[in-house]
C-alpha cells in the first residue's frame, strides 16, 4: 500500500500542486503490472532491481530516487495513453 505522506517527505514533494500530481499518478494511472515495467525500464539503463525493491520504494519503505523516478515515468506513460483513449471515445 502506498503511504503518500511518507513519499512526499522522502522525495521532497512540498507544494499542493506537486502532491496532487503525484497522488493522481500513483493512484489513478499506475498499472497493476507496474513492477515488471519498472524493472524492464531500469534494465535498459543497466540497473538490476527485483520486484520487492520496486514495491518497497513505491510504498515508502525504502528510498531510491532512480526506482521512484521510473515508477513515476510508467505512471505518466499510462496517463498519456488513458487520455488519448478518452479523446478517441469522444470522436
State each model region's role.
Residues 1-27, 75-91:
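Basic, amphipathic alpha-helix used for nucleic-acid engagement in HTH/winged-helix/SANT-Myb modules
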Residues 20-43:
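Polyanion-binding surface elements
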Residues 33, 40-59, 80:
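Short, basic interhelical loop/turn and adjoining N-cap
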Residues 55-56, 71, 88:
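Flexible domain-boundary/linker segments
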Residues 60-73:
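Short, basic-rich loop-to-helix N-cap that marks the start of a DNA-contacting helix
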Amino acid at each position: 500500500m502506498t503511504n503518500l505522506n511518507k513519499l512526499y517527505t522522502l522525495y521532497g514533494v512540498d507544494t499542493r500542486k506537486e502532491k496532487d500530481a503525484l497522488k493522481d499518478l500513483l493512484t489513478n494511472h499506475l498499472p497493476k503490472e507496474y513492477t515488471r515495467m519498472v524493472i524492464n525500464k531500469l534494465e535498459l539503463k543497466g540497473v538490476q532491481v527485483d520486484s520487492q525493491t520496486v514495491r518497497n520504494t513505491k510504498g515508502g519503505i525504502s528510498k531510491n530516487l532512480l526506482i521512484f523516478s521510473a515508477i513515476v515515468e510508467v505512471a505518466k506513460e499510462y496517463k498519456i495513453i488513458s487520455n488519448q483513449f478518452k479523446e478517441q471515445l469522444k470522436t
